[in-house]
Amino acid sequence: MSHLDNGFRSLTLQRFPATDDVNPLQAWEAADEYLLQQLDDTEILGPVLILNDAFGALSCALAEHKPYSIGDSYISELATRENLRLNGIDESSVKFLDSTADYPQQPGVVLIKVPKTLALLEQQLRALRKVVTSDTRIIAGAKARDIHTSTLELFEKVLGPTTTTLAWKKARLINCTFNEPPLADAPQTVSWKLEGTDWTIHNHANVFSRTGLDIGARFFMQHLPENLEGEIVDLGCGNGVIGLTLLDKNPQAKVVFVDESPMAVASSRLNVETNMPEALDRSEFMINNALSGVEPFRFNAVLCNPPFHQQHALTDNVAWEMFHYARRCLKINGELYIVANRHLDYFHKLKKIFGNCTTIATNNKFVVLKAVKLGRRR
């Protein structure tokens, strides 16, 4: 846990999933503190919109203003709810919207934590363009190293005149005034043909590797299991290309597409609808934190290309949680397949959780591993 003192309230904040005590990661950063400083003496009139509040630092600090927390991460929503409870703040003080929803009209203040991907930032700025006014105070923040010329140009292009502050504690802010500059329409998704198939893959703004098939998924697809039956999971599904291939290779199976990103799940659904509509009755789509809340002993197989970062931080906490949930939700003799960078050494992590692990395939960068749920472990 970490403490954040600001002009609104003193907070105790925790990351979600929690990090270990040996290598703790903080649940807020200097950019959060810097953003809150700008509002200390500001009268807030109209709705407060907070975008990409990773662990709820801004939402908790501004809870008395009933802010809207907008983002594309269900884990961030869970983190914010947990930190509201931790600080004795009514959860209903914050209204949660995902990035595909319509934003509230005429906000008084918009606070943006600059996301990792420029595509998501552009989608969010275009959504803001429809609701902000010239009186809306628009402030964005990030580590100074993550604010580039292209970031500032995007604010200018979509919203209007933009300036940046001096760095403070290695953080920098962006101030923007809306004046409705001319702007061409942009498609909701980016699409590309998947080689070796007649499929067109559609990707919303925040989907990993949205402009083409990433090399890890490409390697994984060469080693996917065939002729499985029952329910199988594409965990951390992204655009659903793994699950789509599983539907094709396993005609007797049902595939459950799971991701914490609403945009990823929307992309997966769109890709099944447009490429294998006949398989929709064998498909389920779920926005979730891994397999949290899913009944145990349900699935025959889980397939996963786990992330090794959360927001801007490198961490295996999310992957570790995925593996534990996968084991809980697999049937006896159910199988977990993963692809990962070789340097992450997931072989020993899986062996610790499952008691076994087999290398299916490897190249100079990636490894495909399989672990089997052999029975109950203490």
Curated annotation (Swiss-Prot):
Reaction it catalyzes: guanosine(1835) in 23S rRNA + S-adenosyl-L-methionine = N(2)-methylguanosine(1835) in 23S rRNA + S-adenosyl-L-homocysteine + H(+)
Domain of life assignment: Bacteria
Principal cellular location given in the protein's record: cytoplasm
Alphabetical keyword list: Cytoplasm, Methyltransferase, rRNA processing, S-adenosyl-L-methionine, Transferase
Gene Ontology cellular component annotations, sorted alphabetically: cytoplasm
Database matches in InterPro entries: DNA_methylase_N6_adenine_CS (IPR002052), rRNA_m2G-MeTrfase_RlmG (IPR017237), RsmC/RlmG (IPR046977), SAM-dependent_MTases_sf (IPR029063), Small_mtfrase_dom (IPR007848)
The UniProt record lists the keyword Cytoplasm: yes
UniProt subcellular location: Cytoplasm
EC number: 2.1.1.174
CDD domains recorded: AdoMet_MTases
GO molecular function, one term: nucleic acid binding
Pfam families given in the database record: MTS
Family: Belongs to the methyltransferase superfamily. RlmG family.
NCBIfam families: PRK15001.1
Role, per record: Specifically methylates the guanine in position 1835 (m2G1835) of 23S rRNA.
Protein name: Ribosomal RNA large subunit methyltransferase G
Protein source organism: Shigella flexneri
